[in-house]
Amino acid sequence: MQVILLDKVANLGSLGDQVNVKAGYARNFLVPQGKAVPATKKNVEFFEARRAELEAKLADVLSAAEARAAQINALESVTIASKAGDEGKLFGSIGTRDIADAVTAAGVKVAKSEVRLPNGVLRNVGEHEVDFQVHSEVFAKVIINVVAE
């Protein structure tokens, strides 16, 4: 199925690209989320008329994401207290929700879906570097300092 992308989609293309995708992917994901429209003659003409407006909107979203990333990077470190054993292992773990809540309490609103933990949840006391994906192209880093209560 041919679609016109209205937003940058990872591993697929960017704004304005006409790509061929499976019908289910277009029908169930791209079109409902507003990331694409079917590539009919009418939609192609409509898109070309609105191209500058959509590019400006995309640039605004990107600049807002970069501003949020700068705020997150300005925090540098956030401390989370949790119960831990003698060897520094936590009773339980610190996941994306706990990290998002701690960063939000520190002054920058962050959703748990923006927290990236490639090595899994935090299970030890100490400093851990955590990435935040604010936008598909914009990342931020904060050091999470886990201390025992």
UniProtKB/Swiss-Prot annotation:
Gene Ontology annotations of biological process type: translation
An example Gene Ontology molecular-function term: rRNA binding
Biological role stated in the UniProt entry: Binds to the 23S rRNA.
Lineage: Bacteria, Pseudomonadati, Pseudomonadota, Gammaproteobacteria, Enterobacterales
The organism's place on the tree of life at top rank: Bacteria
Assigned GO CC terms: ribonucleoprotein complex; ribosome
Pfam families, alphabetized: Ribosomal_L9_C, Ribosomal_L9_N
Assigned keywords, A-Z: Ribonucleoprotein, Ribosomal protein, RNA-binding, rRNA-binding
Organism: Klebsiella pneumoniae (strain 342)
Entry protein name: Large ribosomal subunit protein bL9
Family assignment from sequence similarity: Belongs to the bacterial ribosomal protein bL9 family.
InterPro entries reported for this sequence: Ribosomal_bL9 (IPR000244), Ribosomal_bL9/RNase_H1_N (IPR009027), Ribosomal_bL9_bac/chp (IPR020594), Ribosomal_bL9_C (IPR020069), Ribosomal_bL9_C_sf (IPR036791), Ribosomal_bL9_N (IPR020070), Ribosomal_bL9_N_sf (IPR036935)
